Amino acid sequence: MIGPAGSSRRLLSCKEDEKMKIVILERNSVGTDVSVDCIKDFGEVTIYRNTVTIEEVKERVKDADIVIANKSPLNEETLKDAPNVKLICEFATGFDNCDLEYCKSRGIKVTNVVDYCTAMVAQHTFALALALSEKLPHYDDYVKSGEYSAQDRFSNFDIPFLELEGKTWGIVGMGNIGRRVAKIAEAFGCKVIFYSVTGKSTCKDYPQVDFDTLLTESDFLSLHCPLSDLTRNLIDAKALKKMKKTAVLINVARGKVVDNTALYEALVNEEIGAAGLDVVENEPLEPTNPLSRLKDRNRLIITPHLAWASVEARTRCVSGAYENIAAFLRGENRNVVNP
């Protein structure tokens, strides 16, 4: 089992009866191949493989001082009977499972782990983009079907594909991941533009454009923004109709940033070229989601929310959570998202 790298593993000097009661609600969210034993440095740890229902959350947090979670809802309903909770530590960067205002009213600090998966999410962004732009599913199938062995020439390129060089790469969300993607896109020879949903971006390295310009000019459009009232269904039917018919959409942000029904219709009607998704509206993918009916892997590739989940990234995530707890117990604020 892989242990967390980079954490200081410093034991705090506290009496045994002062140690925290810590609950890990979704141990499986970081994978069973990555150790969470370091958390035991801080007290009595109760570990659950997964926590699904509201009742499970309520029962499991009721005596906890520290709650470590990923997707479990942590709000008034689930926390009102948990008087001792002082810290919620996300095994994630996202924290939309937490009611930050309620937690603040209770004096509960919420922390997240930042920048642990930047490299991996950027890498996966291009894995999707390259697979779709080069029609790799088609050509892999062509070889494995025996057609390549049966043909009378050395090469086959029956479905045209294009280079990244010289294309325009549009980005929504110029944070750590967006900036990393921008640098890689530049290395491929792309022109990078971006749109700031809030209008408050301080990035001066790339041209900031309005939303319509982003949609109409981008050959590749990748999403790296959090889910908020401003970004929910940001990519809807109206937005998709403004994109190039050859454009490739990549969503490694949050599923509900894209209207999945509108995307399905845009792909079926060939309003855009292709889409690569690591997230969908409701996860796991529901059979009723129309995207589940689209089987053409040259037009649509969906991966099961794994862009963040390399072994290295998951190990850094545990280490980051460890450091957040250690800082909290020293009376310091580290990665607190509801100050």
Regions flagged by a language model, labelled:
Residues 2-7, 11-66, 193:
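N-terminal glycine-/charge-rich "phosphate-binding" loop or analogous flexible N-terminal tail
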Residues 49, 91-92, 108-119, 196, ...:
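Short beta->alpha connector loops at strand-helix junctions that form conserved
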Residues 246, 252-339:
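Rossmann-like dinucleotide-binding domain for NAD(H)/NADP(H)
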Residues 25, 70, 91, 224-226, ...:
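Short, well-ordered coil/turn residues at beta-beta hairpins
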Residues 75-79, 193, 197-290:
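Rossmann-like adenosine-cofactor binding region
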Residues 174-175:
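Glycine-rich Rossmann-fold phosphate-binding loop(s) that bind the pyrophosphate
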Residues 114-168, 180:
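Phosphate-binding beta-alpha-beta segment of Rossmann-like dinucleotide-binding domains, i.e.
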